[in-house]
Amino acid sequence: MTYYTYTEGPLGRMLFTADTQALTGVYFIGQKYEAKPRPDWVEEDHIPVFTALRGQLARYFKGELSTFDLPLAPRGTPFQQRVWEALLQIECGATMTYGKLADSIGYSSSVRAVGAAVGRNPITLIIPCHRVIGADGSLTGYAGGLERKRALLLIEKTHTNHGDTKSTEDTEQFKLEFAR
């Protein structure tokens, strides 16, 4: 059985999906590859994993949490699963290029395939695909949009030792611009 609910967040409305034991999806509404509720899904706001997710997201956006502790069950191919598992190893506030991510899982000649798997991550933000950047350091390819990717990286740099004091002002300014 698949359960779903919607919630409002600092970077827009989100859809959460879960089975009876674990989170299966976190999507920004309107993002690329966003899941759409199906007739056999059950809308349920108060299952334990959704309650835990909301609490952890609130702490994350306040800078009080850098690593999520939730049961995850993303659905994908074995290759996608391997890529998503590698994404979980990228520390909050840090970034990694697609090439280094491919190297880290033993697929150095398959950077595009790794990039495609990153783009299909069904649990955005929790499995931190926003921390993957282009070889030249540029922000590229985020299903939730580059503005959200930029905001998430600024938020993380503000609250970790990877950031600087200027990041707080940048993050607050970005939140104002994003809300318009």
State where each predicted segment sits:
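Conserved segment of winged-helix/HTH DNA-binding domains
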Residues: 154
